Amino acid sequence: MASGKIAAFRDFSAAAMPNVLRLTDLISEGKLAGKRVFIRADLNVPQDDAGNITEDTRIRASVPAIRAALDAGAAVMVTSHLGRPTEGEFKPEDSLAPVAVRLSELLGCEVKLVQNWVDGVDVAPGQVVLLENCRVNKGEKKNSDELAQKMAKLCDVYVNDAFGTAHRAEATTHGIAKFAPIACAGPLLGAELDALGKALGQPARPLVAIVAGSKVSTKLTILKSLADKVDNLIVGGGIANTFMLAAGLKIGKSLAEADLVGDAKAIIDLMAARGASVPIPVDVVCAKEFSATAAATVKDVKDVADDDMILDIGPKTAAQLADQLKASGTIVWNGPVGVFEFDQFGNGTKVLAEAIAASSGFSIAGGGDTLAAIAKYGIADRVGYISTGGGAFLEFLEGKTLPAVEILEQRAQRQEALA
């Protein structure tokens, strides 16, 4: 990694997260031995109808914080939400029981599941317990101070290691951090913020963003935020169709939002005014219908017919964009550029994914469809950082304050003032 990139990363970290206390700081200072540590993790994993965990990435990602606290001699409590339970009404399908089993396998020790834990938890140093689904507790979603104060009394140290919920102000992500004796960021949360800071703070140039998806409306704030920052803004999917309309091109019966053409044109003009660009496709892959068996036809953009649906970028466009990505210093990737679930409309996403993997620049990727594309094309080990954040990742790109991070910043400043 070039020294310039490291410097950019450090500069942004200092600016974006002033003095946020980290779990690693406490461990290096020997401050966890014998302490009660409450870790808010993100263990919200998918399950099949029988309750079997189908994908355990989030559980595996939570292990380093838990292991570090155990090794430091702490009594460890871990909680998470799972699904969308009704507060005050616990149902079997809301239980973290399968997660407790998987955690015990990964940690190599017993992980007891504790019900009705708000008023007290029995755990000894060197032990870890999993506290049942925190969203079952009344007041969790509304960030109740009463609930948060009860939870804060359970611990000496609160650790937020759940970047995926950092955009939500809830009792276990925000309220408890106000009242716990010490509040800090865990290694997963810290790594997410470092990676995002590296990509957007003082990034190595050129900075290229890929923002794709079906609708401009859902990502308009992100597009406008990035238009101020990036050198190239690559758009894909239905979003690209709206930008093609803004550029005066025909898109047939493709998915687009005619009412947002003005916004798209404003973004194109804003980028052009500062010497940046929104590359408009020169060729596209069309079909007459949206289906897994639809025949794919490559066309120049000027040849799109009235009954065509654009379902991918064409090979010339993909090659041009791949060259830009390979030459970039920093890449932010959110969304596939075509309907990659159907192989005949997946070439654009595949070519860009391989270009990102081949780039010597720093890359960060996030969003469910993006992660699925990374898995499909086997490039996970060649992406600089893969965000587990989902909604939090998108809100960071929008330039929004993440409540769970903001409270850690405030606590760090208070803790420093008292030191």
Curated annotation (Swiss-Prot):
GO terms for cellular component: cytosol. GO terms for molecular function: ADP binding; ATP binding; phosphoglycerate kinase activity. Transmembrane segments: none annotated. It catalyses: (2R)-3-phosphoglycerate + ATP = (2R)-3-phospho-glyceroyl phosphate + ADP. InterPro entries: Phosphoglycerate_kinase (IPR001576), Phosphoglycerate_kinase_CS (IPR015911), Phosphoglycerate_kinase_N (IPR015824), Phosphoglycerate_kinase_sf (IPR036043). Coiled coil: none annotated. It comes from the Bacteria. GO terms for biological process: gluconeogenesis; glycolytic process. Substrate binds at residues 42-44, 58, 81-84, 135, 168. ATP binds at residues 219, 341, 367-370. The keyword ATP-binding applies. It is found in: Cytoplasm. Its EC number is 2.7.2.3. The keyword Metal-binding does not apply. Keywords: ATP-binding, Cytoplasm, Glycolysis, Kinase, Nucleotide-binding, Transferase. Its main location: cytoplasm. Pfam families: PGK. Pathway: Carbohydrate degradation; glycolysis; pyruvate from D-glyceraldehyde 3-phosphate: step 2/5. Belongs to the phosphoglycerate kinase family. Monomer. HAMAP family: Phosphoglyc_kinase (MF_00145). This is Phosphoglycerate kinase.
